[in-house]
Each structure stands twice: as C-alpha cells, then as structure tokens.
C-alpha cells in the first residue's frame, strides 16, 4: 500500500511542480534564471519544514500519510535534480553569475525556509 501512496503522491507532486514552475517562469519572463525551479524548491522547503515539525511534535502523520505526503507529494514536487540540471546548463551557457546565484538562493533560502516552517508550526501549536 505504501508504494501505491508514494506513486500517487509523486504523480500529484510532479504535476503541481510542473504547473507552478512553468507559471512562475512565464511570469518572470526570464530565460536566464530558473525562477520556476527556485520557487518550487523554496515552497517545498517551507512545507516540508512545517510538516516535519507537526510530525515530530504532534504525531500528525501515520506512516502511510507520511509516505504519501513527504516521499510522494513533496518528493515529486521538490526535485533538486532539476536544480542541478538548471545550474549546469547555466554554467555551460557561460552564465556563471546566474549559476552561483541559483546555488546560493536555493541552498541558503531553502534552509532558511525549512527553519521558518518548523518555527511557524511550533508557534501555531505551542
């Protein structure tokens, strides 16, 4: 059953990633910086931080719902493989500043938003 939940969650997360990522990229009107991937990764980092706090402190997830949400939906939604590919493509295209900005923004802001997700969940259910 867990494999089916992960598969369904992964399908949902992948579709959400595609829709949000392509929309953000089209709104940004930028072909030089992967704003769509950045936004997906940052939102995913916040959400996983928030839900992790609930799972750890509130027991909010069963093993099945954890597999569905964390591994399935969020695993399909936040793919750092796309981040790596975008960064390598920027390097290949000679866009070193954008490549470094992409790495810095994804790593630093991603970690900050995981922390923020934990903190917000903690304060809401304190």
Identify what each model region corresponds to.
Residues 1-126:
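Membrane-interface helix-loop junctions in multi-pass transporters/channels
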């Amino acid at each position: 059953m867990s494999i089916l939940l992960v598969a369904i969650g992964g399908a949902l997360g992948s579709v959400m990633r595609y829709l949000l990522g392509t929309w953000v990229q089209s709104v940004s009107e930028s072909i030089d910086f992967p704003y769509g991937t950045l936004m997906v990764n940052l939102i995913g980092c916040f959400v996983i931080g928030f839900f992790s706090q609930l799972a750890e402190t509130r027991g909010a997830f069963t093993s099945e719902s954890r597999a569905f949400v964390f591994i399935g939906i969020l695993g399909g939604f936040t793919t750092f493989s796309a981040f790596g590919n975008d960064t390598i493509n920027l390097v290949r295209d000679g866009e070193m500043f954008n490549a470094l900005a992409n790495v810095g923004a994804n790593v630093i802001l991603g970690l900050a938003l995981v922390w923020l997700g934990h903190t917000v969940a903690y304060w809401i259910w304190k």
